[in-house]
From Swiss-Prot:
Membrane topology value: Peripheral membrane protein
Gene symbol of the encoding locus: murG
Gene Ontology cellular component list: plasma membrane
PANTHER family attached to this UniProt entry: GLYCOSYLTRANSFERASE, UDP-N-ACETYLGLUCOSAMINE--N-ACETYLMURAMYL-(PENTAPEPTIDE) PYROPHOSPHORYL-UNDECAPRENOL N-ACETYLGLUCOSAMINE TRANSFERASE 1
InterPro entries reported in the protein's UniProt record: GlcNAc_MurG, Glyco_trans_28_C, GlycoTrans_28_N
UniProt record similarity statement: Belongs to the glycosyltransferase 28 family. MurG subfamily.
Protein's pathway: Cell wall biogenesis; peptidoglycan biosynthesis
GO MF annotations, alphabetized: UDP-N-acetyl-D-glucosamine:N-acetylmuramoyl-L-alanyl-D-glutamyl-meso-2,6-diaminopimelyl-D-alanyl-D-alanine-diphosphoundecaprenol 4-beta-N-acetylglucosaminlytransferase activity; undecaprenyldiphospho-muramoylpentapeptide beta-N-acetylglucosaminyltransferase activity
Record-listed E.C. numbers: 2.4.1.227
Official protein name in the record: UDP-N-acetylglucosamine--N-acetylmuramyl-(pentapeptide) pyrophosphoryl-undecaprenol N-acetylglucosamine transferase
A matching Pfam family: Glyco_transf_28
Amino acid sequence: MRMMVAGGGTGGHVFPGIALAEEVVTRHPANDVVFVGTARGLEASVVPAAGFPIELIEVKGLKGKGIAGALLNLLLLPRAFLQSWRILRRWRPDVVVGVGGYASGPVVLTAWAMRIPTAVQEQNAIAGLTNRLLGRVVKAAFTAFPEAARHFAARKVYQLGNPIRRRLMENYMRPESAHGQPRLLVFGGSQGAHALNMRVIEALPHLADLRERIQITHQTGARDREYVEKGYRACGFTPDVREFIDDMSAAYAGCDLVVCRAGATTLAELTVCKKPSILVPFPAAADNHQVKNARSLVDAGAAVMIEERDLTGEVLAREIREILDAPERRERMARAAGRLGSPQAAKEIADVCMELVRRRWGSPFGQAREPGQKPARPPDPAS
């Protein structure tokens, strides 16, 4: 089976696509996955780094661009559809999955017109504009939150959760790493989050009495690293401040509490890794979807939410202290998070995709390929 994953822009769209691709290629040596995105999106760098091929199209978003900007970007669509048609003709995928972001629109619509089975994967509680539009034509809509189902026909909805990267799945099987002191993990996404970084520094004086009893690992992004490290030292903390955390699996396994944003991929990781959290939704997220995402964990008892307009150093310090000082509460939050986890999401989405392929092409392996044609796959780590 050959799958095409279309879309991207942010890690919240790209990483679930990579997680699904990892599942597909491990099922059969002839399976492969190709991505389609834009040169400006995160996919242009992280997809090749994951070992998958990527094709690029020229397209820009329409929402929030103003009338003039939207009209200019509309003029790019005919070219984007032509590029999509050429890519689809060249790769001949058996199924196309849109993961959100404006790059997915032309590819999924063109695939539908070519009678290739199509699906969308919606990561958030409020479906994005592109996925809402594509939902009218695709065969399946994979959702992670019950609230997202209202954007799609009921017969198309599969609420299976968000796929997470294979390395992070280790947390589902591995035990907690042993440590004596409470450990706090802070991050704002792959690029960091400036406002969150600043509020944590403001919280440190209110936690000064804990500096000998707490360990904090803080991912800041490149912009704030030096300033944040100085802030920790000024308050007497031994800093573990990093621009980027390469091994998030180990970071999750080694912490007792997480302070972070409320992107869908982050929440999927928190629930599979069974981590209590303090969530600070990104206020500029489209349709305020991070607040809706966070509420699902708050309502289940797995997290505390502080909206950024209410976030001060004192408020954040109080919440951190109350949770870290209450082991039984942390345990209850961890159990609640685990009940929301979907460790099988990638597998179950791949199962549905294979059924779509079987219905269209008569075999779960898809269309016949030319003799000698090698599948496009990431290199085998064992080789």
